[in-house]
Amino acid sequence: MANPYERGPNPTDALLEARSGPFSVSEERASRFGADGFGGGTIYYPRENNTYGAVAISPGYTGTQASVAWLGERIASHGFVVITIDTNTTLDQPDSRARQLNAALDYMINDASSAVRSRIDSSRLAVMGHSMGGGGTLRLASQRPDLKAAIPLTPWHLNKNWSSVRVPTLIIGADLDTIAPVLTHARPFYNSLPTSISKAYLELDGATHFAPNIPNKIIGKYSVAWLKRFVDNDTRYTQFLCPGPRDGLFGEVEEYRSTCPF
């Protein structure tokens, strides 16, 4: 039986590594004054009239939505409705960012324009975030098992135990990160996630804490593949996640491990 959530052509490496996907994208401003519980943001959505999963993305400590805007547009162009948010203050801590990601999902479903609301399948939601936004992503995933996917990017959180998470989670770390070093953040976060869930750990080679703030082929490719696989239940994308990218010398990926198959 055909998957009703499949969107777009059969995927290839070239399609996933390109700066934009197959869908034309429109955008809509979410005013800080109209946003309840977060600092406003920008919604990117496919122009094609259909229903799509929805994704909320938080920036990191001291960051604004501009630091993750490229991800909003990139992911929307593959068939998702995406909001990149400003936080209430740029100094908000991870657990505050979790609440704001949740508020942003609610905003898209209930308060955005009809063009946005009519395109969202509210049963298929996901969250992403950079740095403290990645910590917020983990926190919300631990609180909302109904989420379909979570992607923390070079995440930072004081809590190291995420064994309560039941959401398919892709953690992306960076080997040269000195702000949230993988040895004390991304790796122990991944290791603490239960082996019973679909999870993966991708460590970028030669990359710093701020790798998610500029267009990155690897982050874009594997974030889209993860969202497609778990928000859209689209098994055409499993080929990119299992066995996943090769790691080692002279590659763009330092390490990749997962609970494949999924």
UniProtKB/Swiss-Prot annotation:
Compartment list: Secreted; Periplasm
Chief location bin: secreted
Biotechnology: applications noted: Shows promising applications in ethyl alcohol distillery processes as it may be utilized for treatment of molasses wastewater. Has potential for application in biological recycling of plastic waste products.
Catalytic reactions of this protein: a butanoate ester + H2O = an aliphatic alcohol + butanoate + H(+); an acetyl ester + H2O = an aliphatic alcohol + acetate + H(+); (ethylene terephthalate)(n) + H2O = (ethylene terephthalate)(n-1) + 4-[(2-hydroxyethoxy)carbonyl]benzoate + H(+); cutin + H2O = cutin monomers
Entry's Gene Ontology molecular function annotations: cutinase activity
InterPro entries membership: AB_hydrolase_fold, FrsA_esterase, PET_hydrolase/cutinase-like
Result of altering residue 65 to E: Decreases activity on poly(ethylene terephthalate)
Active site (record annotation): 131, 177, 209
Keyword annotations: Disulfide bond, Hydrolase, Periplasm, Secreted, Serine esterase
Catalytic class of the enzyme: hydrolase
Binding positions for poly(ethylene terephthalate) per the UniProt entry: 61, 132, 156
Documented EC number(s): 3.1.1.74, 3.1.1.101
SUPFAM superfamilies in alphabetical order: alpha/beta-Hydrolases
Pfam families, per database record: PETase (PF12740)
Superkingdom classification of source: Bacteria
CC terms in the record's Gene Ontology section: extracellular region; periplasmic space
Cystines in this chain: 242-260
Sequence similarity: Belongs to the AB hydrolase superfamily.
Functional note: Catalyzes the hydrolysis of cutin, a polyester that forms the structure of plant cuticle. Shows esterase activity towards p-nitrophenol-linked aliphatic esters (pNP-aliphatic esters). Capable of degrading the plastic poly(ethylene terephthalate) (PET), the most abundant polyester plastic in the world. Capable of degrading the bioplastic poly(lactic acid) (PLLA).
Protein name stated in the entry: Cutinase 2
Organism lineage string: Bacteria, Bacillati, Actinomycetota, Actinomycetes, Streptosporangiales
Gene name of this polypeptide: cut2
